[in-house]
Amino acid sequence: METKNNKWSFAGHNIKEFDIPFICRRLLINSLRIPAYLDFQNMKPWDTNTVDTFQFWRFGDYKNYTSLKLLAAAMGVPSPKDDIDGSMVADVYWNEKNLQRIAIYCQKDVVTTGNIILRFKNMELLKEEQVVVVQ
């Protein structure tokens, strides 16, 4: 997330079509209220507080899907996919019961997404020592 005029912005790869809808659906299923900062139902797309690298990279092209791994490679950003990828998460969760492995996978995706945003802005990528993981 980044702040803009003291407002939070959520950032992610395909966050508008996967992450945020998934989180909101899970909230409803569990009888929880959707927080105002995630309720985009009556908002215009440009009024949402999201930075979506997937949407940005499309440039209006809706024919193709570009994975985070492919976008990272195209932008010269180191790939986070050195252990598992999204297709393996369910197996790691249900069969291995290894939440720590999934958490590390997600943390790497966050850093990669952040570096892609920095690359879009022609800024220097984060160095490993600049990344702090809060547990």
Regions found by a protein language model. Name each.
Residues 1:
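Noncatalytic, basic helical substrate-engagement surface that gates or grips nucleic-acid strands
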Residues 4-103, 116-121, 125-130:
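Metal-dependent phosphoesterase core characteristic of DEDDh/y 3'-5' exonuclease domains
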Residues 132-135:
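C-terminal accessory domains and tails appended to enzymatic cores
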